[in-house]
């Protein structure tokens, strides 16, 4: 069982491993830099050495770690300057993951800003293909979206169509976010519905391509398109659904990463404990 959460790199990037260990994680996700800007500080030799050393000491499997793209890039944008900056950031992040020994980089698929799904997907595929040319073993994971206006890749069929256009295939995989899937319209509230939803995912995308699972309950209801993560078992998906998802991921040996809120109801420590109980 590999379960953990998104952890902070505040102070230095190796602190993320300390934060993961403190939360009793057997998997974790980070931003490799400040996610709210375009500029990234170069990783120093010490940054890289300390991160790798602590990860080795932690006994957390390297293949249960991933990084997430920063917030600003939009790979589906029709704006050429924004597109070029987004692709450059993606390539840079792939290289940073390679330096740190992180095997997976999760990316959002972006917004076509009203130009239509076909145009957005064309730009997205172009950008991802460019990043796929990097000469390392980092795999870029496409994350399904919640179905917000102008987004692409919410529907498993469309996600599969995007995924199958990407070359070389070995450079790409998928990250499934349970909150996004649920608020798009995939029912995950019972064991039977979880089985049905993952069966549809397998049909169009392929379970073998699912490398990381983002385990989040949803603040909203089924099909509402509200991208608001919530505490496990306390949202629209509920305890039965979350439990069935955890059991499925464990059976398939897919690392589970929580991106749940920290508030008066629960923190990361409690949500991780809850996830382990559901297993």
Swiss-Prot record:
Q: List the disulfide bonds.
A: none
Q: Name one GO molecular function term.
A: DNA binding
Catalysed reaction, written as an equation: Endonucleolytic cleavage to 5'-phosphooligonucleotide end-products
Cofactor binding note of this UniProt entry = Binds 3 Zn(2+) ions.
* PROSITE patterns assigned: AP_NUCLEASE_F2_2, AP_NUCLEASE_F2_3, AP_NUCLEASE_F2_4
Q: Which GO biological process annotations does it have? A: base-excision repair
Keyword Hydrolase in annotation: yes
InterPro entries assigned: AP_endonuc_2 (IPR001719), AP_endonuc_F2_Zn_BS (IPR018246), Xyl_isomerase-like_sf (IPR036237), Xyl_isomerase-like_TIM-brl (IPR013022)
Q: Does the keyword Zinc apply?
A: yes
Record keywords, A-Z: DNA damage, DNA repair, Endonuclease, Hydrolase, Metal-binding, Nuclease, Zinc
Its needed co-factors are:
Zn(2+)
UniProt cross-references to Pfam families, sorted A to Z = AP_endonuc_2
In this chain, Zn(2+) 2 is annotated as bound at: 143, 177, 214, 259
Broadest EC class assigned to this enzyme: hydrolase
User: Where is Zn(2+) 1 bound in this sequence?
Assistant: 68, 108, 143
User: Where along the chain is Zn(2+) 3 bound?
Assistant: 180, 227, 229
Q: What is its EC number?
A: 3.1.21.2
- Function, please? Endonuclease IV plays a role in DNA repair. It cleaves phosphodiester bonds at apurinic or apyrimidinic (AP) sites, generating a 3'-hydroxyl group and a 5'-terminal sugar phosphate.
Family per UniProt?
Answer: Belongs to the AP endonuclease 2 family.
What the entry lists under PANTHER family is as follows: APURINIC-APYRIMIDINIC ENDONUCLEASE, ENDONUCLEASE IV ENDODEOXYRIBONUCLEASE IV
Q: What name is this protein filed under?
A: Probable endonuclease 4
As recorded in Swiss-Prot or TrEMBL, the protein's gene is named nfo
């Amino acid at each position: 069982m590999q379960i953990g959460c998104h952890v902070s790199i505040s102070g230095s990037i190796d602190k993320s491993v300390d934060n993961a260990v403190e939360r009793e994680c057997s998997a974790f996700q980070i931003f490799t830099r400040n996610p709210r800007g375009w500029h990234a500080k170069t990783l120093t030799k010490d940054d890289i050495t300390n991160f790798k050393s602590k990860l080795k000491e932690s006994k957390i499997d390297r293949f249960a770690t991933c990084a997430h793209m920063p917030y600003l890039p939009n790979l589906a944008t029709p704006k050429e300057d924004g597109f070029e900056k987004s692709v450059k950031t993606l390539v840079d992040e792939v290289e940073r993951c390679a330096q740190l020994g992180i095997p997976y980089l999760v990316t959002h698929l972006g917004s076509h800003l009203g130009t239509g799904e076909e145009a957005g997907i064309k730009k997205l595929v172009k950008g991802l293909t460019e990043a796929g040319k990097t000469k390392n073993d980092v795999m870029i994971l496409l994350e399904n979206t919640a179905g917000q206006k102008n987004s692409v890749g919410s529907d498993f069929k469309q996600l599969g169509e995007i995924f199958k256009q990407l070359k070389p295939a070995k450079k790409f995989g998928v990250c499934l976010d349970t909150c996004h899937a649920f608020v798009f319209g995939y029912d995950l509230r019972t064991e039977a519905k979880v089985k049905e939803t993952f069966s549809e995912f397998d049909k169009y995308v392929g379970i073998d391509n699912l490398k990381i699972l983002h385990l989040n309950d949803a603040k909203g209801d089924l099909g509402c398109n509200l991208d608001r993560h919530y505490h496990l078992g306390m949202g629209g998906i509920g305890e039965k659904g979350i439990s069935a998802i955890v059991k499925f991921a464990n059976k398939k040996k897919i690392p589970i990463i929580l991106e749940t809120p920290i508030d008066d109801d629960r923190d990361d420590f409690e949500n991780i404990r809850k996830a382990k109980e559901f297993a």
